[in-house]
Amino acid sequence: RQSMPGMMDTILNLGLNDQAVEGLAKKTNNPRFAYDCYRRFIQMYSDVVMELGKSFFEERIDAMKERKGVKQDVELDANDLKELVKEFKQIYLEKQGEEFPQDPKEQLIGAVKAVFRSWDNPRANVYRKMNEIPYEWGTAVNVQQMAFGNSGMRSGTGVAFTRDPATGAKKLMGEYLI
């Protein structure tokens, strides 16, 4: 079977909620990191699972940076990110008519459905046609423990493939960001 790297939607930090974010802040001794993860999760869940888009959230981030006189997200502190979490949850409430889900099981079910739904997104359809991947094959959903790429100067993120994503050639390749 062929892979479709980068075609299916992804939701990071699933399971975070108002209680878990406090536990993450305590465990890592880094409230800024914990609230950054939570605001990213709310944004991704709202976009991928609920299909609200990213613009509402990006506007709030930009407004916060302007208020604080900073240029980059990384310059926002823990209190700024806590405020963004409140604002993001308010956007969710206004757009969905319900509170952001606090139950990790509910979050997981929504995320799994969204990944299956992403099999039919335009990007995936074009990729399948270009690579002659039958629609009937469907897709799988992977759920795995989070490996944080934003927890400080000694963390990063990356992806590895056993095939060249562009050609399908059998060779190990990947990329990373620090």
Describe the function of each predicted region:
Residues 1-178:
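Nucleotide/phosphate-binding sheet-loop regions of phosphoryl- and nucleotidyl-transfer enzymes
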